[in-house]
Amino acid sequence: MKSESHSGGLEPHVNSLALKAILVVDDDQQLASALQWILADENFLVDVAFDGEEALVKIAAHDYDVVICDLKMPKLQGDALYLRAREIRPSLEDRFIFITGYATDPIIRHFLIEQEVKFLVKPFPIGGLINCVRELLG
């Protein structure tokens, strides 16, 4: 009877964060693409949507662990996307990180405070975003 032995090849090392899926939603395609590359380099699976309607379709079809979302976008703004996404996937309620250049706008500020969501003000340090993602994933 022939016996096979494993030659000790490397088993794939899977970081627990490697399987976490992130959706980046921003109408600034350059920023969204840059965030996609940076987060993928940190071993996250990253998908991108360039407006809120596209994001809503993706959220309905896929189970994301974190959504990084701009607030001011065409078609469906970030605050409306957040409220609708929670209806589709209640688990996303505390999994949004908003990125905005308008944090001093009274309406946006009210939304961010009232919903008690995480947010970063553009321009933000990449390390701050990565830390925020890791914190949400706990």
Q: Which ranges hold each PLM region?
A:
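Non-catalytic signal-transmission and effector/linker regions of two-component phosphorelay proteins
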Residues: 1-21, 87, 109, 125-138
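Receiver (REC) domain active-site loop signature in two-component systems and cognate sites
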Residues: 73
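Alpha4 helix (beta4-alpha4-beta5 surface) of REC/receiver domains from two-component response regulators
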Residues: 80, 93, 102-121, 127, ...
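Active-site residues of response regulator receiver
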Residues: 70
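Charged docking surfaces used in two-component/phosphorelay signaling
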Residues: 33-41
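Acidic catalytic/metal-coordinating carboxylates
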Residues: 50-54, 77-81
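Short hydrophobic/Thr-rich beta-strand motif most characteristic of the beta2 strand and flanking loop
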Residues: 43-50, 58
